[in-house]
Swiss-Prot record:
Classification via Pfam families: RadC (PF04002), UPF0758_N (PF20582)
Organism: Delftia acidovorans (strain DSM 14801 / SPH-1)
Protein name: UPF0758 protein Daci_1904
Region forming the signal peptide: none
Record motif JAMM motif, residues: 175-188
Keywords of this entry: Hydrolase, Metal-binding, Metalloprotease, Protease, Zinc
Length: 226
């Protein structure tokens, strides 16, 4: 249904004013940001297409979208693209700010959300490391390796060198499972143990290894696997 055909109280802006933003769907919130559609494509349809980007479905996928992804959507001109990219970047910065201002372990949920934002929608496996200071606040997130996780695909020396470069006091390991399943495999456990041993030599603690997928995450520390 086109936006103009909805009853006034059901239109996104009026609904938000009356009931608050949490009462709106993702599509409705996006429609407010976009404001208008185009001839033959209403703003609600445009918002729906943004949540169905090829290989980047849902909000987590949209948060990883770049300029080229948005340009491919018919009806998104330069102005709307710039507006959306600015909103998405602000969302990413807000999540990173939470981890920089307080210890990561004080909010494991924030860590999981942050990692899902960066990794969950990837179609290939990515291994990343959160480098933390002595108070366990975020210094940086770096993607280290791509491909199926095995002992031979993750080089402990490279992780140690990057940790020393950042003067990290601790790290959180992370990778995604494109399959959508977040169970830790034998390879995941072996890689974690190898990195723990290597980082222990330079007095850097591995606080956790988080596995993420769209809508799901697993903390190996939380499961008693570290």
């Amino acid at each position: 249904m086109a936006l103009k055909d909805l009853p006034a109280q059901a239109q996104p802006r009026e609904k938000l004013a009356a009931r608050g933003p949490s009462a709106l769907s993702d599509i409705e919130l996006l429609a407010i940001v976009l404001r208008t559609g185009m001839a033959g494509k209403g703003v609600l349809q445009l918002a729906q297409e943004l949540l169905q980007l090829p290989g980047r479905a849902g909000l987590s996928g949209l948060l990883q979208a770049g300029h080229a992804d948005l340009k491919a959507i018919k009806g998104l001109g330069p102005s709307k693209c710039a507006q959306l990219l600015a909103v998405l970047e602000l969302a990413r910065r807000a999540m990173a700010e939470q981890l920089r201002e307080r210890p990561a372990l004080a909010s494991p949920e924030a860590v999981a959300r942050y990692l899902q934002l960066h990794l969950a929608a990837r179609q290939h496996e990515v291994f990343a490391v959160l480098f933390l200071d002595g108070q366990h606040r975020l210094i940086a997130l770096e993607e280290m390796f791509r491909g199926t996780l095995t002992r031979t695909s993750v080089y402990p020396r490279e992780v140690v060198l990057r940790a020393l470069h950042h003067h990290a006091g601790a790290v959180i390991l992370a990778h995604n499972h494109p399959s959508g399943q977040v169970q830790a495999s034998a390879a995941d456990k072996a890689v974690t143990q190898n990195l723990q041993a290597a980082l222990r030599l330079v007095d850097i603690q591995v606080l956790d290894h988080v596995i993420v997928a769209p809508g799901a995450s697993l903390s190996m520390a939380g499961q008693g696997m570290l």
